[in-house]
Amino acid sequence: MVFNVRESTRGTRREFPHEVEVTDHVWIPMSDGTRLSAKLWIPKGATVHPVPAILEYLPYRKNEFTALRDSIRHPYFAGHGYASVRVDMRGCGDSEGILTDEYAKQEQDDALEVLDWIGKQDWATGSVGMIGKSWGGFNGLQVAALQHPALKAIITLCSTDDRYADDVHYKGGALLASDMLWWASTMLVYNARPADPAHVGGAWRENWLERLEKTPPFVEEWMRHQRRDGYWKHGSVCEDYSAIKIPVYAVGGWADGYTNAVFRMIQNLKGPKKGLIGPWAHEYPEVAVPGPQIGFLQECLRWWDQWLKEEETGIMDEPVLRVWLQDAVPPKTDYHVRPGEWVLENSWPSPNVQEKAYYLASQQLSEEPGQGTETLMTHQHHGLYAGVFCPFGQEGDMPSDQGIENGLSNTFTSEPLVEELAILGFPKMQAKLLSSSKRANLAVRLSDLSPSGTSKLISWGQLNLTHRNSHEFPEDVPVGEEFIVTVELDAIGYKLPKGHRVQVSLSPVYWPHMWPTAEEVELTVVKDKDTRLILPDYTNTTEEAEIVPFERPETAAVMEREVLRESGRTREIRHNTVTNEWILDDFSDEGCRRLPANGLEYGSTNQNIYRITEGDPLSASVQCDWTLTVGRGEWQTRLESTSTMKADERKFYVSSQLRALEGDVVVYDTTRNFEVERDFN
């Protein structure tokens, strides 16, 4: 469940230093007349003895959709002497207006006005921190860069400093087919849900119809910007790290798709900073899987006490970066726990990381340069066993054994390691290539081959080769001429034991993570000194006595909920041996729940189907179907959407259908079709 609170080893805290008063709905007026809806958790007596505030600012509906996860965190902060403020962004939940896109200027301007509003409340000291995961982690960084005087510190989880390089739209300059349409279809149907009549009154239906009519499918704008132009630079704080002057605590997980930015921010931010990377998926570390979970809320309090209450907690005396260095494990599609150890670094890049190079030889990785050339295999269904780009910790999220994938790509394997090899940082693949076409892609997988023969994916990367020199100014791939590229793989912390082997695999195809080129390409690798795998070889110098242990995970009590339908997930790969079509069918039923506190019922199902036919890259297609329900008693609404994406030699074609029902009556049913030229993609 993306927005459920999973069972975990955490403790539940029911008594706090402060009693908490809760206001479910309060309006925050914007200067243009639009009102945003907020929920408040305020320590009792704060109007006499004001307290600092913690803001979470999201498009995900506080009344029901994030209510469970909000219930374990915001009361916890409030119980420790903070006003906790949860705001539905413009056009979402009970808030008025329209959400037109991710991370738009309007979103950031509204956040500044929310900070103004908090500062004027009689319970507020005027010091505010922002916390958020994913979208809330993104906008925390973006608002920090705007330097509002009330914002004193942020905690950003599962986010990025570079919207083009590390998000669900493009990766390595190639369209991220597995996620771009899925996320656009997700936000299309999420945004289509109505405000709660209990809070907004009889205007809910008029507001709902306006929201349905005016909220665009975000994918259209994303597809208009296939290169790293000004659209993506907006909201990418890497454009000017110096704009962020307040303290930043950046948190990521190895199982997540948003970990790379932690290293970049620790390297480039000039102000106070800390980085934390655990084994976790796209979730808060006190409940995330794979474990071990940590007392993250206590860690947050140390941060907030340091910067919002100006109390010395010792948190800044500890090393700037703390990382869970993972042990080798057999490949599985889900893990409850990833064994490993915490390591500490005082800076990044670290002097404890040195480059270790392997060269490509005949199906081997060698310490000496190879000879000759090798044409890469082209199998359009290579990549089906890669797992998902952004795991939330559901069953089926993680990559399968890579044995099948290795047979569909050119795989090079080292001799058995004579001693343990720890890697921490960004692996890189430098390759000298020859191409038969002006358009070509390259996917690189790094795996751990165990003595038993299992192959576990450690990291991966992909590159649209027209972007080899610049994501902003792509250029044709030279045909029939040698050229050199470097593919940076995702950052990783992993220990390969003695006796294991390093594997690297190359392919011009990686479906569905990488949308295929319009025609099959013959890509040849030149096996000489310029073609090599470069690993960040890590020496652990951390002394156990240096490590300040995290406290046991604990939260406030999760609010009461009734399960009306259980959740479930299936992820299947099918092959039609007559047509040679391959289908990846990913279905998630997030169940249906009722919240007795407000009577709201909500549920959803999502099915994503990725199709491709061997030998025909133009057969690639994606279809994403959603059904969402939200209601109370006789008031029931239902949203249904179907989004599709396909391409020919010249264009991408996208269709977005949205259907809304009140009870059994269809009140809205519209399909939008969109096409755009392929821009070096």
List the model feature ranges, each with a label.
Residues 9-49, 413, 417-419, 473:
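N-terminal cap/lid segment of alpha/beta-hydrolase-fold proteins
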Residues 70-71, 79, 145-243:
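Accessory cap/linker subdomain of secreted extracellular hydrolases
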Residues 10, 286, 290-661, 665-681:
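C-terminal, loop-rich substrate-recognition/catalytic regions characterized by aromatic stacking residues
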Residues 261-273:
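Active-site-adjacent alpha-helix of alpha/beta-hydrolase-fold enzymes
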Residues 44-119, 168-169, 175, 447-452, ...:
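Cap/lid segment of the alpha/beta-hydrolase catalytic domain
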Residues 123-134:
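Alpha/beta-hydrolase fold nucleophile elbow
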Residues 133-142:
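Glycine-rich nucleophile elbow surrounding the catalytic serine of serine-hydrolase chemistry
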Residues 244, 250-252:
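Short beta-strand/loop motif that positions the catalytic acidic residue
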